[in-house]
Amino acid sequence: NMFGTVTGRTSPSSSKYVFSASKWARNFIKPGLGNYLVYLDYKSQEPAIMGYLSGDQNKIKAYQSGDIYIHTAKLFNMVPDNATKQSHPEERGIFKVIDLANNFGQGPGAVAESLKCSVSHAKFLMNQYRNIFKVYFRWIDGFIENSLNKTYFSTCYGWQRHIKSLFTTKEGKKKHIHKSLLNWPIQAHGGEILRQALIDLTDENFKVVALVHDAVMLEIPIPEFKQRLEEAKQIMVDASIKVVGGPITVDQEIIKSNYEQETKDQKLFNKIMSHIDRYTPLYN
């Protein structure tokens, strides 16, 4: 379902689509004879979109640094310039919590609980974060206010969300939709990027076999695989530039035989198949 969510992201059926099912089911994915599969996904797409749409240079530099959370810790002067994920995991973890909380509407109470600190210290960190990335927050606040005045939100390509009420009711409780409004322009433009990439890849005769949130899976003949893989990655980067005005890098996972799982999912698949094997002789 290409426009199945309010943000315009795809929403395939969990009972009919392998990437919406439990992860162990991905073991059934396998390229056709004479082909490889490749899974291409946009790396840290949401923060990249935030930076490019708002023009916040601190956000953009944080994304382009390769590690948003370590870069933010450096902006707070909490780690040295040569800090890495390996050398300062604790500080990195702090700014991962703060980043997600500020960008998606969590309050200081939730942050304090996650960081095991006082609410006042959580407020201080969150206010500092908003000050460092003030261009982004000024943009998102303005985007929401302007959209509410029009009573609808819109992406640069015209996908819209019409606002009838600022509240939803769930299980008899009234809830403000502010968090989803903060997230909407980011996710919706992510959907636009994926659609643009799909169009451009199809125009260049790539066989797109799956769409997965911010990723595509392609099937490419082995003799031309290396060249076509690089072409596909560049097409996806170019699609991000068309939509949000800046390049979003693309990671790759090549599948030459059956899909390789993480250990816990592989164990579950093996367990399920062993149970099936026990019963198979009974019906032969």
Each language-model region and where it sits:
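Acidic, glycine-rich two-metal-ion catalytic cores of nucleic acid-processing enzymes
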Residues: 1-86, 143-144, 148-215, 229-236
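Non-catalytic nucleic-acid-binding interfaces of large nucleic-acid enzymes and RNP effectors
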Residues: 1-36, 43-45, 66, 91, ...
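Catalytic palm subdomain of template-directed nucleic-acid polymerases
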Residues: 50, 107-120, 216-233
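Short, surface-exposed acidic
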Residues: 60, 77-94, 119-125, 136, ...
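Residue-level preference for well-ordered alpha-helical positions
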Residues: 73-77, 112, 116, 237, ...
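Short, amphipathic alpha-helical "recognition" segments used to contact nucleic acids or chromatin
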Residues: 93-104
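Extended, well-ordered alpha-helical scaffold/bundle regions in very large, multi-domain proteins
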Residues: 104-143
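C-terminal polymerase-core module
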Residues: 131-183, 223-284
